[in-house]
Amino acid sequence: MICAYLQERFPNTHFHFIAAGIPSLGSLAHSFRLQRDVLDSGKVDLMFVEAAVNDRGSGVDSATQMHSLEGIARHAWKSNPSMDMIFMEFADTYKNNDYDKGTVPGEVFRHEAVAIHYNLPSINLAKEVHDKIRNGEFDWNNDFKDIHPAPLGEELYFENIKKFLELSFNHVPADLKITDHALIKPTSKYSFEDGHYDDVTHAQHDANWTYNSNWTPSNRESTRDGFVNVPMLTTEAIGATLKFPFTGNAVGIAVVSGDDTGIISYSIDNDAPQRLDLYTEFSNWLYLPYYQLLGKDLKNGKHILTIKMEKDKNLNSKGNACRIVHFLVNG
């Protein structure tokens, strides 16, 4: 709807729209996929950013959310200093409950904190939905229905975004010149402003790992676009080990977590190993794109990430599998 509105509003303008949204992904994923999924498509003039819905359920801590959101803004402006950005916060039942208690949802607070720091507009659609429900204008279960809203919710989102754009366009002077945004001092030196994907072929691994150039599931579990029929580094073997050399101050993995996903142990350089269960509450029916940061706030430089498949597994998992789609590197 927004694309159609912009084309109607500016009929003499040729638009190139990039539909980069992927269900289940939050700010951490966005900060590392921004380059490939958006910026590599060409010079971007206007970018909409939303991660508030999925950040709550992703298990990503508040500091990492801030590093991610700030990294998105800074990375975008390093690509095109004149790019305009609009932050948005979509609705869910968790946010409704927070607002009922008089509390600003943490995900909304962090989106707005980054927006304020960089003088970016922020459209709080979660608060709009909550207030209309409390005013009796509609009901969540019967009308709005889901975080992927029913037509009523889609129309509400569209009208609010359109209203903001109309107000902005109507206050633009005829002689306005495009200027660069100032890349001010970050709130943290560890923001993921250089976040990117690194190829799984760069890992050094034992014979228990297999490079699959076009992975598809062997069962009937659901998948997400961009995370099926793509290259992956996979294993189902206990003890399978790999080493991934990287340069930067943060590292992680993007995996697909299905019903046989296992537990890994990992370490960076000579640190003590830590354990991470890659099985999720959705893994019994979906190969969930699952982004996990394994090291952050590191000294900027060369490091080695080591990953090993553990013998034990989640009680609900059917195996000890790990399927890595991307390594994540900030640097």
Tell me the role of every PLM-derived stretch:
Residues 170-245, 254, 316, 327:
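Glycan-recognition and processing domains
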Residues 4-16, 20, 25, 31-174, ...:
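Alpha-helical cap/lid subdomain in secreted, periplasmic
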